[in-house]
Each structure stands twice: as C-alpha cells, then as structure tokens.
C-alpha cells in the first residue's frame, strides 16, 4: 500500500491536533462536577460514561496524521489504567498540556531531545516527591474516601471500603452485575477457583443449579482418575463414614465418573468431581495450596501414595463446599492456621524473588485465595446503560482503593500536582539550557488537571490554580463544595500510585511526540485507486 509522509513542524502540528481532539473529549469528565460523554455503540444502546480510558478507546480520527497523535495519547490512558486502574483523565490532560507547551518551545528553536530529557527528569522528581509525601492507608474510612472520590458515589465508596477490609490487602475484590436494582456486597470466606462440576447430575440444589456439600471430605489427586478398581476402596470408606465427598483431580472420567454419577442419582453417596484448575506446575502448586487449606494430602504416585491403597487419613475436610457449573468454593477448610500462615509466607517470598510479571501476578492470585477470601460487589441499576456506567465506576473505585493501599494517598483535586512544583524548582537549579526549559514546560503542565477540575465546576481555572499554589500542603480546592480548605480531612484524596502513573506516562508520550520529525501513514484507499486508474504503468 502506498504511503504518505509529512515532515518537521507539519507532522508535529497534525499530531498535536489529534492529541487535542482526544484530550478535549476526555477532559470534560474531570472532577466531581465533570460532565458525561455519550458513546454510540455498533450494537445495543449508547454508552454514557465519565471514564477517561473508555472514551479514549472509542476514538479513531479520520485524518491519519491526527490519528497518530490521538493513538499516542490513548496509550497514556490505557497504560495508566493497566498500572493503576484509574487516573486516566488526569494522565490525558497532563499529556495534552505537555505536548502543547513543548511544541511551542520546539517551534521557537528549542532542541527537542534536551527538552524531552528535562521533561523526563522533572517527571521522575515529581514522582519521587509524591511517593515521599504519601500517607499510608490502612483503615476502612480512608479506603472508602479514595473509592468515593473515584466513583463520585458514597455508597460505592462504603462498599469498597468494607470489601477491602473484610478480605484484607491480599484478598480478591471482584465486580459483577446484579440481577436486582440494588448494589450490594457478597463476601465468600474460603478458597474459590474457576472450575465447575464434571456432570450436571451432581447438582443438589436445583433452584440455584449448585451442588452443596455440608461437612464434606476432600480428595485431592494429582493425576487423572479413570479406573474404578482404584477409586472404589476409598469410596466405600467414605460411604461408611457417611459424609459427602469433593474430588479435585486432573480429570475424572470413564468408569470412575459414571460410578459417581450413578451414586449421585441413587443418592447412595453424595459426591462431586471437579477438574483441578490451571496446568503443569501451577496446577501442582494450587493442589498443594488446597491440601494446606483443607488439611489433607495430595494423592501422588510419585511420593508413594496410590489411590487404591489410601484411606480417610489423606482426605481433607471442609465445613461447606459449593460447586456450580463454572466454579468451586471451599469454605472453612480443615487446615490449621499455622500451616496456612507458613504457606502465605512462602508465596510472599516467591513473589519478591520472581522476575516475571506474569508469575508475580499468578502468585498474588494464589496468595489472595489463601489469605483473604473473595469479595464480590454486585452492581444493580434501573437500565442497561446505567448499569454499565455504574459497573465501570465501581471497577475504577476498586482499582483506586487497591492502588491507595499499595503506595498510600496524596492530596486530591489536582492540588498534589500543583504543590509538587517545589520538587521541580529544586531540579531546575541543577540544569541549564533547553533541559531547564523542559523542566519549566513540565512545571507549567502540572496545573492542567486542577485547571480543568475548576473549569468544569464553572469557575475560572487560572484563578483557582494561583490560589491553590499559595496554600500549604494538604489544602486545596474542593470542587464538590466549591470551597478552599483542608482536602485530606474532607476526604478528597487520590492514590499516590494513580497520580504517579499519570505523571510518568504523560511525560513519556509527550517526549515521543516532541522528538518526532517524520510521520508516515497509509495513503487513503480511494486516492490509491484513483491514482492507479489514471497512471497505468507508473510507479507511485
């Protein structure tokens, strides 16, 4: 396909126009008095949202050069969302301000490389200053405040605070759609995993389509179970004990599965077979976790434990097991608190030593399952459109709360960024030339989020920025009440991680755009065809 090429200022200006279009669409949502954006969907009704990354993802511009700029700023929003789960609008507004001021300086003759270097150094200095000034978060009230600011909804803030408090810092908080109008919290104490029963005949509660086992024994097997002679001796012992049985194995098939099904239909033995989740080493590790939670052993021929020879002593136990077609939850396993604490310690040390992000994430999931249980926030609303919007807000609030627990909180309302200028001024004294100019560009951009929070609240942004820059740390402009004062005690706080991610990602993308000298895009198809039609045999 033929390409079009633009150079120098023309390329940068076109990209800036794209940055502006995307950022202008996103920044109207900033702050407690920000507005909504309506997105047309190719199927279903329109989506109403005030989430920066959701809006950014929908935007593709017609002009290919402008679209390059828009896509680069979109990456700021998505990267910030991936790292911190919130703060996407702040990141977009910062990037726009940096690009605008930076390009002005480049057009006036500044060296873009030195300018970009100054911006990066300033971003690092502000990031460190934010971390240093962050207040740790450990109580329910502070978590609820962060979640309330993120979702603009006190009820959501309370629910997220309660969920995080109940499952602990290592627990899992998920968000699901509720079938009612109510938004409420469900906490599952215990270990859950995403594998359901192997046969619908195991269902004991036909209304909810679940198999519920009370006071159950748990058999954990590393390999497949298919031979009936291997399984039968143990089944007979379990039947004598008169307790229901949960079997978790690589797979249960053939005679073994059909025998369990027949027993379930005849109600002679209540048993449920479930596949162990994951593959390879992760599955082995997870089965070992389950053994510790239930107080049992994993039946494994490699260590001399054969299924046909073992008795009830290798089985774990649980007060309650609930299995549906997609998931299994083991509540109140029979394992000792000491054994579980040791296992948690072991997984934490593995998390610290692993180099792979993927491994770290999976280890954290295992840790959460062991340590805290699972909290589910069920979101309800009157209409489908409202439900989507609320669910998004709750997901952002959960992400913000987790980020706050990780790195602490800073003053909200854009005040922390305006007041972080002192860190930038210190740095400016150490630099000279265009690098120092880059620091100035960054310092001026730091007021952009506060400017737009104030503007969206109907005030003069510049006046508010000047006033906040004179206030002591911890104070700022509360756009919800339109008053200046102590933001921390008023609960207007942001997670340090969210604000830091916004600063670093915005600086990174602004630097890329400032140092761009050439833009190459595909030639529009109709021009191509037009060209081919009239110039047969000519090279393009």
Swiss-Prot record:
Pfam families: Cpn60_TCP1. One of its GO terms (cellular component) is cytoplasm. GO terms for molecular function: ATP binding; ATP-dependent protein folding chaperone; isomerase activity; unfolded protein binding. It is found in: Cytoplasm. It catalyses: ATP + H2O + a folded polypeptide = ADP + phosphate + an unfolded polypeptide. InterPro entries: Chaperonin_Cpn60_CS (IPR018370), Cpn60/GroEL (IPR001844), Cpn60/GroEL/TCP-1 (IPR002423), GroEL-like_apical_dom_sf (IPR027409), GROEL-like_equatorial_sf (IPR027413), TCP-1-like_intermed_sf (IPR027410). CDD domains: GroEL (cd03344). It is an enzyme of class 5 (isomerase). The keyword DNA repair does not apply. Its EC number is 5.6.1.7. ATP binds at residues 29-32, 86-90, 413, 478-480, 494. Residues 521-540 are annotated as: Disordered. Keywords: ATP-binding, Chaperone, Cytoplasm, Isomerase, Nucleotide-binding. One of its GO terms (biological process) is protein refolding. The keyword Cytoplasm applies. It comes from the Bacteria. Belongs to the chaperonin (HSP60) family. Forms a cylinder of 14 subunits composed of two heptameric rings stacked back-to-back. Interacts with the co-chaperonin GroES. This is Chaperonin GroEL 1. The lineage of its organism: Bacteria, Bacillati, Actinomycetota, Actinomycetes, Mycobacteriales.
């Amino acid at each position: 396909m033929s390409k079009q090429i633009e150079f120098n200022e023309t390329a940068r200006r076109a990209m800036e126009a794209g940055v502006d279009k995307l950022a202008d669409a996103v920044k109207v949502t900033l702050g407690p008095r920000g507005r909504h954006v309506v997105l047309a969907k190719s199927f279903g009704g329109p989506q109403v949202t005030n989430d920066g990354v959701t809006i950014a993802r929908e935007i593709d511009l017609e002009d290919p050069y402008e679209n390059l700029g828009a896509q680069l700023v979109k990456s700021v929003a998505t990267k910030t969302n991936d790292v911190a789960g919130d703060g996407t609008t702040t990141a977009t507004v910062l990037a726009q301000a940096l690009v605008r001021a930076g390009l002005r300086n480049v057009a006036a003759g500044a060296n873009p490389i030195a300018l970009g270097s100054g911006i990066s150094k300033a971003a690092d200095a502000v990031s460190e200053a934010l971390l240093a000034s962050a207040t740790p978060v450990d109580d329910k009230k502070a978590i609820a405040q962060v979640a309330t600011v993120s979702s603009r909804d006190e009820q959501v803030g309370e629910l997220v605070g309660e969920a995080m408090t109940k499952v602990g810092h290592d627990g899992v908080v998920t968000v699901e759609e509720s079938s009612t109008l109510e938004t409420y919290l469900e906490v599952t104490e215990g270990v859950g995993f995403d594998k359901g029963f192997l046969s619908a005949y195991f269902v004991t509660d036909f209304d909810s389509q679940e198999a519920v086992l009370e006071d159950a024994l748990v058999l954990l097997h590393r390999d497949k179970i298919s031979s009936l002679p291997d399984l039968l001796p143990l089944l007979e012992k379990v039947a004598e004990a008169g307790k229901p049985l949960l079997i978790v194995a690589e797979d249960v098939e053939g005679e073994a599965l059909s025998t369990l099904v027949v027993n379930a239909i005849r109600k002679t033995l209540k048993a449920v077979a479930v596949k162990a989740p994951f593959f390879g080493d992760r599955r082995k590790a997870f089965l070992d976790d389950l053994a510790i939670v239930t107080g049992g052993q994993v039946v494994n021929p490699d260590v001399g434990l054969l299924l046909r020879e073992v008795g009830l002593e290798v089985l774990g136990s649980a007060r309650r097991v609930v299995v549906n077609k997609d998931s299994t939850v083991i509540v109140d396993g029979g394992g000792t608190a000491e054994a579980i604490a040791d296992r948690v310690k072991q997984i934490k040390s593995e998390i610290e030593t692993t180099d792979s992000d993927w491994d770290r994430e999976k280890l954290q999931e295992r840790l959460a399952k062991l340590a805290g249980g699972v909290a589910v926030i069920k979101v309800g609303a009157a209409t489908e459109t409202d439900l989507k919007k609320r669910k998004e807000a709750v997901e952002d609030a959960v992400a913000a709360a987790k980020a706050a627990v990780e790195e602490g909180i800073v003053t909200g309302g854009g005040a922390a960024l305006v007041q972080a200028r002192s860190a930038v001024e210190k740095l400016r004294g150490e630099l000279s030339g265009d690098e120092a100019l880059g620091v100035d560009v960054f310092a001026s951009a730091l007021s952009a989020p506060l400017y737009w929070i104030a503007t969206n609240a109907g005030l003069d942004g510049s006046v508010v920025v000047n006033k906040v820059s004179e206030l002591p740390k911890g104070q700022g402009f509360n756009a919800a009440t339109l008053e200046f004062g102590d933001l921390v005690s008023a609960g207007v706080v942001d997670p340090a991680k969210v604000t830091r991610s916004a600063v670093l990602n915005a600086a990174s993308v602004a630097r890329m755009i400032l140092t761009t000298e050439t833009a190459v895009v595909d030639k529009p198809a109709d021009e191509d065809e037009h060209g081919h039609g009239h110039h047969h045999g000519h090279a393009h």
